[in-house]
Amino acid sequence: MKFVVGCELEEFKDYYRRNGFAGEQGTGELGITEEKIITQDPAHLIVWRQNNEIIGDAIWHETSTEEHREGDPRDLEDREILRKLCGGKKDNIVELHEIWLIEKYRGKGYGKRFFEFFEEFIRRNGYDSFVYYADHQAALAICRKRGYAEDYLESAGEYVFYSQLESHAAQ
């Protein structure tokens, strides 16, 4: 299994449909927001391939404590939680928007491997921190095991994880 940055959009949409991901209003179609993120910068899509087949994906984007994306302000509870986790207002954060892994590939350590890859990937691309909203038990377990700072966003029913990455010089 390997992680590949970027993917041809039609191939990705086909994978999304075939695997019945909820997508746009539960239709199995890639959501408008997700498609916009990928179209604006194909490197914001990371696919997980095994034998040249897509078995999982992650979508990410730049964010801040004040806005999800430019022009999309966070609500008060979300802003307060992020400011607390980040130690104040902060720009140039990565938000891990979505992670999917086909069910038959779960429980094989791929999630752990992904977070190791992702941390190094964003560090190499000039970011020093990321945030991830999760409610899936396996994701919660991985984030807690990795020691990410955590809070609960009651309005969304999700946990918010924040990681301040160590610089290469500190390692």
For the regions a protein language model found, what residue spans apply to each?
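Conserved active-site alpha-helix within GNAT-family acetyltransferase domains
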Residues: K112, R124, D135-S155
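Conserved residues at beta->alpha junctions
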Residues: F3, L101, Y133-A134
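Conserved GNAT acetyl-CoA-binding A-motif
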Residues: I93-V94, F115, I122-D135
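C-terminal "cap" of GNAT-fold acetyltransferases
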Residues: H136-Q137, Y152-Q171
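Short amphipathic alpha-helix that is part of the acyltransferase structural core
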Residues: M1-K36, Q40-E66
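Conserved acetyl-CoA-binding loop-helix of GNAT-fold acetyltransferases
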Residues: L101, G107-E120
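Conserved acyl-donor/pantetheine-binding loop and adjacent beta-alpha core of acyl/acetyltransferases
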Residues: I54-E98, R106
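Short beta-strand micro-motifs in enzyme catalytic cores
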Residues: H44-I46, N92-V94, G157-F161
